Amino acid sequence: MKLSKLLQLAVFSSLVTSKNIFDLESLKQGLQDEETVNNDKREPVNLLYLDRFKMGVSDEAKGNAKFKRDPKNVIDPASLKEGSAEEEQKDKREPKNLFNLQALHEGLKDEETKSKREAKNLPNLEALEEALKGGSLPKKDAKNLIDLVALKQSLEKEAAKRDAKNIPDLEALKTGIEEEEGQVAKRDAKNVINLSNFIETPSKREGKNLFDLTKFQQSGQPIKKRDQKILKQEKSLFVLNSVDCFNNLLQSILPQLSSISIFSSYIRQFASIDARTANPQKVMLIVAPDNDSLETKLSDLKPWEFPEQITPEQSEQEQDKTLKNNLLHFLNGHLINNFEENLVIDKSSTDAVTIISKLNNGKFLKIKQDQLSQKFSIRLLDSENWIDVETIKQVENGFVLIINDSLVKP
């Protein structure tokens, strides 16, 4: 009996005796009986018999009934060596795209033995030279060239043609003018200036805007402060251009002169001096250094920095007073109050008109005007160097002389 039937009987017997209780004793007996019975066991599935596998391998190793299969993807060095030997015995194929230098060399030798063909489009210089020497080379007619001989002949033929119209005959015109000059008297020209009248030297007219200094001429005695006398003389001295004369006051003209803007600002800092420039009743002379001279000709100092120097011991008020006194000292060395009342004429110079006047700082100033060039120059009486006056301006109450220098220096 099969094990399944025994299990069914055991279950059934257990159910009869008791419910839900297994009879382990009967189950054990049934299993023992099952082992004694020759029942055909079913063959197991998915089992690997190693003995069979071992026997197959041994048989294959012995080479009794089976042959080894050839290995794949394995290099056989012996066959490779034999193949190389066989390859060496075969004829090598000819390479492609390679020059056969030997054949090329032989071809060049054969080419040298053959006669060379004549080159095309190349000049034969030897034949050309022989043709030029022999003079046998025919000349061809030039193109696009003017035939001067033919042109000359055509012009000569053209001259024989009829007279041209609307063309003046200059030769006939010249002849007619010459005949007319011999027969007819010339009429007076209109609107023509007679230059000969200007070549003559007429008497000079009296100049305008002249500063009459005749009443200030000295009596010929040496110049001394106490003995100065002003005499009249019917003659005008300095001559000025009308473009340098203005019908306004010094206070108005000074701001218009940009070249002396710095010096003009110094004048405006002192109310008393600025008031004199606005007084039309008093004549004042101003010798004004230009801006360039104030920056370059004072030894890198400012006009308020000399002659007195500021010390650290001074108070702020004392320093301001020193600066103000220095600047006033600089201005007084360039100003002349009541100019008409403080000048004399110097007769020692014959080629120029020269006058002498006293500056506000007590020094004497010479002013001269060259009679030929009409240019002005000035110098201090204790100096030998003349300073050219760059520009001079005259107004109702004084003069402004602009110089590129300074009369007061450190």
From Swiss-Prot:
Residues 247-407 form the FAS1 domain. Its main location: other. It is found in: Vacuole. Residues 1-18 form the signal peptide. One of its GO terms (cellular component) is vacuole. Residues 64-98 are annotated as: Disordered. Residues 64-73, 83-96 have a biased composition (Basic and acidic residues). It comes from the Eukaryota. Keywords: Signal, Vacuole. The keyword Transcription regulation does not apply. PANTHER family: FAS1 DOMAIN-CONTAINING PROTEIN YDR262W. This is FAS1 domain-containing protein CaO19.3004. It comes from Candida albicans (strain SC5314 / ATCC MYA-2876).
